[in-house]
Amino acid sequence: EIKQKTWEKRTAVKQEASFKLKVAEEDKDLESMLKFAARTAILTRDMKEDAQAVITALGLPIVQAPSEGEAQTAHMVKNGDAYASVSQDYDNLIFGCPVLVRNLSIEGRRKKTGTLAFQKVNPEVIMLQDVLTNLKLDVEQLIVLAILVGTDYNPGGVKGIGPKTGLKLLKEHGHDFEAIFTK
C-alpha cells in the first residue's frame, strides 16, 4: 500500500512535468523544456529487456527482487552473495545492509536535483557498523530515526522532526519508541 502511494505520487509528478513541458514547448523556453523533459522519462519494458540482455551477455547474474530492491540487495550482502549494495539513498542501511556504495558513476558526476547543472561526485563506501557506532544507535533505532526524518516511503517523515531532533529523541528515550511517537 505504501509503495503503491509512492508510485502514484511519482506518476502525478510525471504528469505535471508533462503538462509543464508542453507549456515550455509552446513558449519555446529551451531551459524549461530540458528540465521538464528529464522529469517525464520512463523506463520501458523494452529498455529493461535490453539491459538484461547486455548483463546476461556479460556473464553477470540478474536477480529479480520479489519485493523491494533495497531489501533484496541488503539480504544478498548480509549473506555474502555480494560485497556491497550500490544506491544513492540510504534506505539499504535501514534494511541492515552492511556495506553501501554511493556515487558510483562512470563520469564522476551527477545531476543536481531541480537544476540542469551537474556536480562532481566521488564514490563513497558506507559501513553500517560505522554509522551505528558514530550515532550510538542500533539497527532498530536507526529504523525509527529513518521513520522520523523520512525515507522513500514516507517522504518528509514526521513534521517538525529533522535529523538532529530525531537523534536527540532517540538518545532521550532509547528503545521506548512509543514515547517518541506520542510526544
Language model features with spans:
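General alpha-helical segment detector with a strong preference for membrane-spanning helices
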Residues: 93-95, 166
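Acidic, PIN/NYN-like endoribonuclease modules and their adjacent C-terminal/linker elements
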Residues: 98-134
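Non-catalytic nucleic-acid-binding/docking modules located in mid-to-C-terminal regions
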Residues: 119-183
